[in-house]
C-alpha cells in the first residue's frame, strides 16, 4: 500500500478540530504558496511543525479537496520563525506567545538546542527562573520523545492509527518492544492482530526469532476463540490450526504451546484428565469467580430472618398472591443472601424481585440493582420502580488509553457501598464482567442472580448462569408456573411450549398477539417484512415503525438477514433527502434520522444529558443518528435521553438497527417483533435462539415463514459447544480456599 500513497510536505498553520480521545484532527497545512486541509489521526500536532504526510487526496462533499493522511514523518522547525510558531502554540508548559517571542529573539535558530541541552541559559531571560527553565526543558524533551517514537513506528510500517494505539499503551517503551518482538503487540494492543504483526515482522531488517512468532500464533488462536464464547480450548484442538497459521509441523506446534506456557502467555489446566489452555486473564477471572463464590458460601451474611406473615403483608399491600416457589425465593434471598432465580416469561420473576427488594429494604439493607446492558437496566428500572444501572456504571468503569479491557473504580480494594446486589439477565454476563462484579462486592454482601436459563449464552466468553446452576453449589429457584394473566398471551404460552420442544400454536385471530405470516419465498418474505413494519403494524396497532417495532433476524446475510432488511427499511422509513446529511461506510449509508446501534463498547465517547456529562457507550445501545457535522467530522447519536458525540472515524462502531440479530437483542423487550424464519442457515436454526426471539416481544409477535422452518428450530435442541471451566473450578478439590 505504501507504494500507492502520495507525499505532502508542509508546515502546520492551524488546527481546525481535534478529538483528544482518539487523536483524529483536521488541520491546515501550508505547502509552498498553497494551503491544504489535512485530516486523519494526527497525534499531538502543533502549529509550526514541518511534517511529511503520506496519504491520498479525497473530495469532501462540502469542503472540497482534502488530503487524508495515514502516515507522517515529523521534523523539528529548522528556522527561528518555525520555532517561534511551535513555542507560541502553548504545547510547552510555561511558554506562551510573549515568552516564546523573548526566547526566540534572544537565541534565534539556536533556540531548540538551548532548551534541550543548555536549559540554564533560559534563566537569562527576565521572568524565567532556573527552576522554570528546568521544567520547560523537561516538557520539551517529553514532547519530542513522543514524536520520535511515532516517527519510528511510522518507519516500521505502522499507519497513524496503529502508531497512536501502540503509543497509548506502551508509551516510551513502544519502539524497544516492537523492535525486539512485534508479535508482543497481538496481546498488548487490541487493534493489532497476528496477521498485521506478521506483516510488520516480515518487513523488518532483522526478523524476530521464530519461536516468538510461534508463541504469538498459538496464543492468538486461543484469544480469537474468545469471540466464539470459549474461555479455554482443549490443547489438542489447536494443533492443526497452529500448523496452518504458522506453516509448521506438529512437533513445532507442540513446542510453541509449551514455550507460550513457559512464557506465561498461556495457562494449562488439567480438567477431567484432559489438558486445556487459557489466556492468563481469563484463567484468573474464571478461577477467581469460583473462589469468591466459595467464600460467599462459607461466610454468608448475617441472617435477616423473615416470617411468612411479612410475606403475607407484602401480598396484601400489593394485591398479589405468591406461589410456593416465589415465597421460597424471597426467604432464601433475605435469609441466606445467595440465590439464582430463573424462570420464563409470565412466571413472576419481576414480582418476586420486587418482594425481595422491599423486604430487604424493610430490614435496613441498601440494595443495588444492575443489568449487563443499558436497555436491560432501563427495563429493570421500569419493572421494579427502583433505579438499575449497567454493571459497568455500577462499578464505575475506567478505561485507559489503548487498553483492550476496562478497569473499574470499585474492586477488591474499593468495594461497593451496599448490602445486596440484584443482577438481572445473568445469562448475558460473561466471565470477565462477572468476575469484576464479584470483586467489587463488600464482605457479607447478598447477591441475587436473575435470569432465564433457556436463553442464549453471552456474546462474550463463558456460560456463567448455566455453569453456576450446573455446579449445584448455589440455591436455585426455578419458577415454572405461568400466572393466569400471563396465560392470556399467546407469546407467553407459546414460549413455554417451545422450551418443552412443542410447536407453537398459531392463532391468527384478530385478538391474538402471536401470528404466522406464511411465506415460502425468501424474496417475498423480505417485501412482506417491510410492509409489516412500515404499514400494517402501525396502522393496525398504532405502534411506531422506528420506536416500537423491531425486526429480529437469525442471520446477518441473505435476503432476510439484517443487512438486506436494514437497507430496505432505511429506503422506506428514512429515504435520501437534500435536508439530511449522510455518510457512506463499507458499502452502506448512514443518514441523519436513522435508527442505529452501537456494536462495541467504547468508553471514550463523550455524552451529554440534561446538564450532566460523561463518557462511554456500550455494545447493543440503540439510538437515533441526529446529526452528521461534515464541517468538523462529528456525528451525534441520541441514546434514550443522552446525546453521544462521535468522531467520524468511529462510524465503524455503529450500524443500522431497523433489523438486528437475535443475539444482539438479548436483554431487550420491544412492543412488536417481526421474526423471519424462512431461509435460516442450519447452524442458526435452533431452539434457544428461537425462544430468545419470542421472549423479546411484549405485545405482538409476527413470524414470517412457514411451519417447516419453525419446526426445524423447535426440534433442534443442540446447543453450540462452549468450552468453559467454571464448573471445574467450583468443585471443592479445585478451589484453593478449601485446600
Placement of each model-derived feature along the sequence:
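Pre-Walker A segment
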Residues: 268-345, 351
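The Walker A (P-loop) glycine that initiates the GxxxxGKT/S ATP-binding motif of P-loop NTPases
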Residues: 91, 124, 343, 371, ...
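Conserved helicase motor core of SF1/SF2 NTP-dependent helicases
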Residues: 355, 359, 363-365, 374-383, ...
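Loop/turn positions that initiate beta-strands
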Residues: 48-50, 593, 620
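Conserved RecA-like ASCE P-loop NTPase motor core of nucleic-acid helicases/translocases
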Residues: 339-381, 450, 514-521, 536-558
Amino acid at each position: 500500500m505504501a507504494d500507492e500513497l502520495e507525499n505532502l510536505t508542509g508546515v502546520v498553520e492551524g488546527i481546525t478540530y481535534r478529538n483528544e480521545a482518539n487523536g483524529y484532527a483536521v488541520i491546515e497545512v501550508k505547502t509552498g504558496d498553497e494551503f491544504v486541509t489535512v485530516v486523519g489521526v494526527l497525534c499531538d500536532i502543533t502549529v509550526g511543525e514541518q511534517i511529511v504526510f503520506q496519504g491520498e487526496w479525497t473530495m469532501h462533499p462540502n469542503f472540497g479537496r482534502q488530503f487524508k493522511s495515514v502516515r507522517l514523518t515529523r521534523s523539528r522547525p529548522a528556522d527561528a520563525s518555525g520555532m517561534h510558531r511551535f513555542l507560541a502554540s502553548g504545547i510547552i508548559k510555561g511558554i506562551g506567545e510573549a515568552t516564546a517571542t523573548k526566547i526566540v529573539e534572544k537565541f534565534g535558530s539556536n533556540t531548540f538546542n538551548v532548551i534541550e541541552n543548555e536549559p540554564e541559559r533560559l534563566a537569562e531571560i527576565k521572568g524565567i527562573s532556573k527552576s522554570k527553565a528546568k521544567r520547560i526543558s523537561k516538557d520539551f524533551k517529553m514532547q519530542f520523545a513522543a514524536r520520535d517514537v511515532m516517527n519510528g513506528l511510522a518507519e516500521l510500517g505502522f499507519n497513524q492509527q496503529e502508531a497512536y494505539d501502540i503509543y497509548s499503551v506502551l508509551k516510551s517503551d513502544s519502539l524497544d518492544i516492537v523492535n525486539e518482538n512485534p508479535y508482543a503487540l497481538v496481546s498488548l494492543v487490541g487493534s493489532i492482530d497476528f496477521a498485521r504483526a506478521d506483516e510488520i515482522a516480515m518487513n523488518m531488517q532483522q526478523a524476530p526469532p521464530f519461536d516468538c512468532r510461534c508463541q504469538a500464533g498459538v496464543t492468538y488462536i486461543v484469544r480469537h476463540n474468545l469471540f466464539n464464547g470459549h474461555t479455554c480450548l482443549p490443547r489438542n484442538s489447536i494443533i492443526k490450526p497452529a500448523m496452518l497459521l504458522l506453516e509448521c509441523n506438529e512437533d513445532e506446534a507442540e513446542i510453541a504451546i509449551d514455550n507460550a506456557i513457559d512464557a506465561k502467555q498461556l495457562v494449562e489446566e488439567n480438567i477431567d484428565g484432559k489438558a486445556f489452555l487459557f489466556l492468563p486473564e481469563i484463567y484468573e477471572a474464571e478461577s477467581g469467580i469460583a473462589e469468591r463464590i466459595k467464600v460467599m458460601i462459607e461466610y454468608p451474611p448475617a441472617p435477616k430472618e423473615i416470617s411468612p406473615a411479612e410475606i403475607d403483608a407484602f401480598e396484601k399491600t400489593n394485591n398479589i398472591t405468591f406461589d410456593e416457589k416465589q415465597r421460597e425465593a424471597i426467604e432464601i434471598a433475605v435469609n441466606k443472601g445467595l440465590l439464582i432465580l430463573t424462570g420464563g416469561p409470565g412466571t413472576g420473576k419481576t414480582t418476586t424481585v420486587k418482594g425481595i427488594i422491599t423486604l430487604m429494604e424493610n430490614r435496613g439493607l441498601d440494595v443495588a440493582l444492575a443489568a449487563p446492558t443499558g436497555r436491560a437496566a432501563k427495563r429493570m428500572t421500569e419493572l421494579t420502580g427502583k433505579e438499575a444501572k449497567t454493571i459497568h456504571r455500577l462499578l464505575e468503569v475506567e478505561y485507559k488509553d489503548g487498553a483492550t479491557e476496562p478497569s473499574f473504580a470499585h474492586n477488591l480494594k474499593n468495594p461497593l457501598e451496599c448490602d445486596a446486589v440484584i443482577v438481572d439477565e445473568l445469562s448475558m454476563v460473561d466471565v470477565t464482567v462477572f468476575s469484576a462484579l464479584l470483586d467489587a462486592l463488600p464482605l457479607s454482601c447478598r447477591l441475587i442472580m436473575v435470569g432465564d436459563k433457556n436463553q442464549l449464552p453471552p456474546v462474550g466468553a463463558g456460560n456463567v448462569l448455566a455453569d453456576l446452576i450446573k455446579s449445584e453449589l448455589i440455591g436455585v429457584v426455578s419458577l415454572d408456573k405461568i400466572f393466569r394473566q400471563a396465560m392470556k398471551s399467546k407469546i407467553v404460552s407459546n414460549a413455554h411450549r417451545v422450551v418443552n420442544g412443542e410447536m407453537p400454536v398459531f392463532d391468527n385471530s384478530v385478538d391474538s398477539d402471536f401470528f404466522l405470516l406464511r411465506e415460502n419465498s425468501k424474496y417475498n418474505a423480505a417485501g412482506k417484512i417491510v410492509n409489516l413494519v412500515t404499514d400494517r403494524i402501525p396502522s393496525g396497532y398504532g405502534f411506531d415503525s422506528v420506536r416500537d417495532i423491531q425486526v429480529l433476524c437469525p442471520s446477518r446475510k441473505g435476503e432476510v438477514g439484517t443487512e438486506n432488511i436494514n437497507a430496505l427499511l432505511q429506503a422506506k422509513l428514512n429515504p435520501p433527502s437534500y435536508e439530511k446529511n449522510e455518510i457512506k461506510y463499507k458499502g452502506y449509508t448512514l443518514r441523519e434520522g436513522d435508527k442505529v446501534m452501537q456494536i462495541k463498547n467504547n468508553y471514550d465517547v463523550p455524552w451529554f444529558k440534561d446538564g450532566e456529562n460523561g463518557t462511554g457507550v456500550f455494545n447493543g445501545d440503540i439510538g437515533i443518528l441526529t446529526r452528521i457535522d461534515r464541517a468538523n467530522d462529528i456525528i451525534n447519536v441520541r441514546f434514550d435521553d443522552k446525546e453521544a458525540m462521535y468522531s467520524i472515524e468511529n462510524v465503524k462502531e455503529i450500524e443500522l438497527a431497523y433489523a438486528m440479530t437475535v443475539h444482539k437483542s438479548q436483554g431487550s423487550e420491544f412492543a412488536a417483533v417481526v421474526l423471519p424464519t424462512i431461509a435460516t442457515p442450519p447452524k442458526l436454526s435452533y431452539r434457544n435462539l428461537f425462544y430468545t426471539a419470542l421472549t423479546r416481544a411484549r405485545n405482538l409477535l409476527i413470524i414470517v415463514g412457514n411451519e417447516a422452518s419453525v419446526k426445524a428450530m423447535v426440534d433442534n435442541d443442540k446447543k453450540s459447544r462452549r468450552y468453559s471451566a467454571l464448573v471445574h473450578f467450583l468443585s471443592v478439590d479445585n478451589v484453593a480456599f478449601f485446600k
